[in-house]
Each structure stands twice: as structure tokens, then as C-alpha cells.
Amino acid sequence: MDDNIAGSGFHGVYLLYCVNPKFKGHTYIGYTVNPNRRIKQHNGGVDKGGAYKTSRKKPWNMILIVHGFPNDIIALQFEWAWQKPTVSRRLKSAATKKKPRERPVQYCFRILSELLRVGPWNRLPLHIRWLMREYEMEFDPRCLPPFHMTVVYGPLVSRKAKQKAVSSEDQRPDHKEKCIKCLDVIKIDEKLIRCPKSGCTMTAHMFCLARDFLHCGNEGGLFCLPVDGNCPQCKGSLLWGDLVKPAESIPSAEDVDEDTDDHWTQGLRL
């Protein structure tokens, strides 16, 4: 999948940077299902759907967005913690107060670095996307994001929700396939996972493979969401996020904000 095309269930938390000379350097953090539309709303003012806090300080640049959240609830929790780090219980052990001479955008990025390393978000296959590379900042070597998260660049392309990405289910052959772990036939309404390694034909129930990854990583009973593991067939190293990566599509202008599609994490709930 093209990493710049964002299908079912895009949820992003973004950082705005004010370029109005009178307020230059001010920042704003928000949540969106459509970054391209949201920045137009912010720069259009309250009458165009923008936030009251950004209306009198426009124009703004959307410089960074974190996406890959499984649903709006988890993304909104992340947004709240990023907006209010000094009162977030997730960051109790971190230095959340703004340092002397620390610019607002530097402070926001430092708090982001801390958030990516704490639960529940530290196990999610998130993408940290620099929409405008001239604003890019390097992570402190002492506060790097988890290895399974990626730093990517460039704008996201809107796509109509009806243009679904081809999934593993869409590619199923006519003959019945068995789960490599439980050996049961994988039914058409069950989540199927394939090994992406060339030449490997491994197929498994999503839940069975998740349990296997957690057990092999000695994380069984601690978490319900694995981070990585090895293919039971070819033994290749796999990131869980690559196996279950959804087709994150940004709704086009005429689409509504609400997203009701199920996400792969639904299948991990006991």
C-alpha cells in the first residue's frame, strides 16, 4: 500500500504551526479524520468549521501528524494527553513543564516523544509523519519512539471511502485454507493473516497468530496486542503492524467525519 494514501478508518492527531507574523510560533494540537480538509477549516476561520482558538491567528501550517490509531477513542485520548501533558496521568514520570527558552513547537515535539513511549500507545503501529519537512526535528537519542513505529514524510492523499484497498480476504482463493496454529478452516467471516515474505504460504487466524506472538515473546497474559514475532512457517521476522495494517483512507470532501468500519483490534477483544 502506498504510505501516502490514507480507507477504512483514518484517525490522526496533528500539530499546527502559526505563520501569522503577530503570533508566529504559536502551536495548536487537534484530531482529524481528514487532514487536508481540516487545515482548510482552520485557515477559513470559525465560519468554515475551524476552531475558535485558531481563528484569529490564521494562517497556520499543519507540520506533523501522528496516524495509525485503531479508532477515534484512542486517538482522542492521545490528543488530550498531548494538549494537557502536565495533568495527564500517562506522563507522571516525565518532565512535562516547558523549559526556559524552549520554543512552543520544540515543547510540543518533546511531549510527543514522551507520549509515543507510554501505554496504551507505545504498542500501536503508529506513523509519525512530517507533512512539511522544513519543520522536522530529530528525536532525542534518549527518547526514541519504539522500533515498530515509523517516521515518514509528505502529504496524505484523500481518497473516496468507496475505493477500498484489496485486503487478504479479497484475495482468498476458492479452496478452503487452514490456520497454521489451530488447523481449523478459516471461515470467510474470520480475520485472516498471511505472511508477506516471498514464497511463504502461511495463513492463520488473526487471534491465533497474536497469541503465538505474545507467547513466544513471553508477553502472554500481559498484553492482548503483539508488537512483533516470527512467522510459524518461514521463521521470518515480522512486525504485527505490517500484518494487520489497515487501508487508512481519508474521506474526500463530500464524505462525513464519522467512521464506523470495524478495525482489526476489534478481533483481539476477549
UniProtKB/Swiss-Prot annotation:
Keyword Nuclease (UniProt): yes
SUPFAM superfamilies from the UniProt entry: GIY-YIG endonuclease
Cofactor: a divalent metal cation
SMART domains associated with the record: GIYc
Residue intervals of every SLX1-type zinc finger in the record: 179-234
EC number(s) given by UniProt: 3.1.-.-
Compartment(s): Nucleus
Record keyword Zinc-finger present: yes
UniProt enzyme class: hydrolase
Stretches the record annotates as Disordered: 251-270
Ranges of residues in domain GIY-YIG: 9-94
Primary location class: nucleus
GO CC annotation: Slx1-Slx4 complex
CDD domains (UniProt xref): GIY-YIG_SLX1
InterPro entries cross-referenced by the UniProt entry: GIY-YIG_endonuc (IPR000305), GIY-YIG_endonuc_sf (IPR035901), Slx1 (IPR027520), SLX1_C (IPR048749), SLX1_endonuclease (IPR050381), Znf_RING/FYVE/PHD (IPR013083)
Complex and partners: Forms a heterodimer with a member of the SLX4 family.
Function of the protein: Catalytic subunit of a heterodimeric structure-specific endonuclease that resolves DNA secondary structures generated during DNA repair and recombination. Has endonuclease activity towards branched DNA substrates, introducing single-strand cuts in duplex DNA close to junctions with ss-DNA.
PANTHER family per the UniProt record, alphabetical: STRUCTURE-SPECIFIC ENDONUCLEASE SUBUNIT SLX1
Protein name, entry field: Structure-specific endonuclease subunit SLX1 homolog
